């Protein structure tokens, strides 16, 4: 499936790695990054509206959708640092050395890392429904870990997680599509089928992405924390109000990383770009204004 009116390219971003990207519109560039267990199609509504006056680039992340899925060899292939470098290379290859960056879920973690590693490239940053990796692990422990069991499952050494998920991939990925949504009609059957097909074919790389978040991504965040590195661009964060339910202050956690922060909560479910596209589009436009 494709976003209507957008053209598609496979763009090489690293040795042996190309990303599938939907591109539409003209104007100042915005890159939109999807999360788990989805593809660039999550942006079909938001991208169409933004493309009226922006160049909009919607890639499948490394390891997801129709993008390449390199084998993990040394623990870095799916680090957020590597995945962020992919996005900077993608934008540059398309003629955009600077751009606004929006990420949801896993894509927001890639966007967060891009903001820290490439502050001269990212003009504005929007993160949807995540906490920074270090804060995520601190917040989702103890009884809170029950709602995030997949983080712990996919953090295990290679072998068992992949085997368990591959044994019933549709059941595994459907569980999260059902659990995290408030308006099931926001993901029509054909879009859901596209997500399941793409995820079914990407079990190993999806697990590698999550495993990196329990290892090398934590190391990188700790290094930035120790060095006092922060996001230097304007940042907007939209989240469900998980903090009040699970006992953490999401706005305060984000403020520690983003001095120029606009934080808000939404009544939409996790898949807010599909459940509340007008709200998310307005958040993006307000930050860019």
How would you label these PLM feature ranges?
Residues 2-10, 15, 19, 29, ...:
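Flexible "cap/lid" subdomain of the alpha/beta-hydrolase fold that forms the substrate-access gate
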Residues 21-23:
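Conserved hydrophobic "DFG−1" position in protein kinase catalytic cores
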Residues 28-34:
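Short beta-strand element of the alpha/beta-hydrolase
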Residues 34-36, 103-104:
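Conserved alpha/beta-hydrolase "nucleophile elbow" surrounding the catalytic nucleophile
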Residues 35, 275-276:
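Active-site helix-initiating loop/hinge in glycosyltransferases
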Residues 36-46:
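The serine-hydrolase catalytic nucleophile loop
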Residues 45-54, 93:
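A short, Lys/Arg-enriched amphipathic alpha-helix followed by its capping loop at the start of a domain
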């Amino acid at each position: 499936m494709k976003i209507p009116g957008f053209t598609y390219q496979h763009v090489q971003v690293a040795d042996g790695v190309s990303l599938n990207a939907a591109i539409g519109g003209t104007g100042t560039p915005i890159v939109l990054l999807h999360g788990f267990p989805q593809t660039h199609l999550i942006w079909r509504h938001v991208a169409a509206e933004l493309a009226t006056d922006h160049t909009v680039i919607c890639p499948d992340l490394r390891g997801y959708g129709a993008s390449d899925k390199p084998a993990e060899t040394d623990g870095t292939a799916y680090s957020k640092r590597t995945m962020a470098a992919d996005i900077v290379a993608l934008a540059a290859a398309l003629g955009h050395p600077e751009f606004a960056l929006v990420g949801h879920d896993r894509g927001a973690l890639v966007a967060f890392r891009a903001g820290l590693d490439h502050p001269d490239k990212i003009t504005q940053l929007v993160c949807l429904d995540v906490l920074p990796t270090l804060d995520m692990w601190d917040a989702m422990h103890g009884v809170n870990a029950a709602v995030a069991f997949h983080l712990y499952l996919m953090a295990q050494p290679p072998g068992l997680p992949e085997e368990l998920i591959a044994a019933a991939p549709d059941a595994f990925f459907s569980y999260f599509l059902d659990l995290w949504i408030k308006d099931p009609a926001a993901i029509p059957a054909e879009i859901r089928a596209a997500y399941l097909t793409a995820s079914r074919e990407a079990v190993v790389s999806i697990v590698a992405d999550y495993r990196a978040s329990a290892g090398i991504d934590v190391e990188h965040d700790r290094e930035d924390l120790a060095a006092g590195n922060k996001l230097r661009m304007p940042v907007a964060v939209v989240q469900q109000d998980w903090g009040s339910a699970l006992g953490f202050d999401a706005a305060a956690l984000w403020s520690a990383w983003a001095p120029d922060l606009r934080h808000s909560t939404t009544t939409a479910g996790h898949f807010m770009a599909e459940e509340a596209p007008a709200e998310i589009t307005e958040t993006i436009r307000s930050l860019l204004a």
